[in-house]
Amino acid sequence: MAIDEAAFRQLANEIEAFVRGPGEDYAEEIERTHAVPPALWVDLRDRGYLSLAAPEDYGGRGIEFSRYLELMELFAMSHASLRMIVHVCNGTWRAIDQLATDEQRKAFVLPQVAGDIRVAFTLTEPTAGTGADLRSSVEREGDTYYLSGRKHLITFGVTSDYWLLFARLEGTRGSDGTVALMVDRDSPGVTVEEMPETMGVRGTDHARLLFERTPVPVTSRLGQEGQGLEVALGGFLTLSRISVAMSCVGLARRAQELAVEHARVRETFGKVLAARQAIAFALAENAADIEAARQLTLHAARRWEAADPAAGTLSSMAKLTAVDMLTRVTDKALQVHGGIGYWEPNPIERIYRDARAQRFEEGTNEIQKTVIARDILGTAR
């Protein structure tokens, strides 16, 4: 049952208060220690923020995707690692669920929604992109797959309990033969290496993974052989790209807030910056940029809810547009602050670093353009 408007507004107000209050305390701790405190995971789980988009009969809040995005905009105004936790936990259950058996749903989906297990989306490889050129492979022997290969840049790959991992049957090419597997981190033949710290999104762990004939039960495969990329692309990446687009909107909104606040109080030559047309016009451009990206993102979400086949392409359009918008907005926001904005612990300095990561998350701008171009040129034929 959809949440009514009054209850939704109450929830949104609660989340905004959390983001601007305790969320900022967590942000300061993360920036100081370069680690996400375990208490943040517990707090987000106990508040129900890690299961907002999951159905009520799964233990979630049952919020429809387009409304959930309005909440994601709020979370994105906080520290990027806080936003990342909410984003990943509200997305991975859906990728697992679409082709899960009842047994798999009980073993993986419901515990993940409840916050009892953590699952990392495990697609990217050192020598492959983010699609059908997977090189990690499995050999089937009876009721067991033996997994060999490498993965890297895996968000929460160090601390997860399971990897939702994509590989291919030995000897296959393209999307044929791809499989989606739930791999237990305690399986034999696994080496986990934490990657060096990133420029932004401090505190979020990323892993390099090596699998050397790691046994995975066939019962841990989602769907059939050949459906691996269906799980990855349709079940996760389309919605995740839309969610990342809205994350860009939220982060840009916070950057704009900081720029406006600074412009109203900072004086030069007897005038506040806001009284100078060059500054006022930059802020006006930001406002229009943010709203345009917000509306395209919501449009993509609603088309996905309507089962429109164009939703995949629209998700790439939304992500491309929102990322480019965020780049412009954060650059202007930092410029409004002047040199002082370049120093820690000014919040705009952190936002500027965090914003750059969005150009990579869930596919680079070049990948999004490739997806869009294939669609429009294919349609033209």
Locations of regions flagged by a protein language model:
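A short, Trp-centered hydrophobic/proline-enriched beta-strand micro-motif
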Residues: 115-123
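Alpha-helical transition-metal enzyme core signature, strongest for iron centers
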Residues: 112, 249, 253-256, 283-297, ...
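Glycine-rich phosphate/cofactor-binding loops in nucleotide/flavin-utilizing enzymes
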Residues: 70, 91, 337-381
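Amphipathic, small/basic residue-rich leader segments at the start of a protein or domain
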Residues: 1-87, 98, 106-111, 328, ...
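A structural signal for short hydrophobic beta-strand segments in well-ordered beta-sheet cores
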Residues: 136-139
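C-terminal helix-coil-helix/basic helical segment that borders enzyme active sites and/or dimer interfaces
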Residues: 24-32, 260, 264-271, 287-321, ...
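A short core secondary-structure module
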Residues: 144, 148-192
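Glycine-rich beta->alpha junctions and the first turn(s) of the following alpha-helix
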Residues: 3-6, 11, 77, 192-291, ...
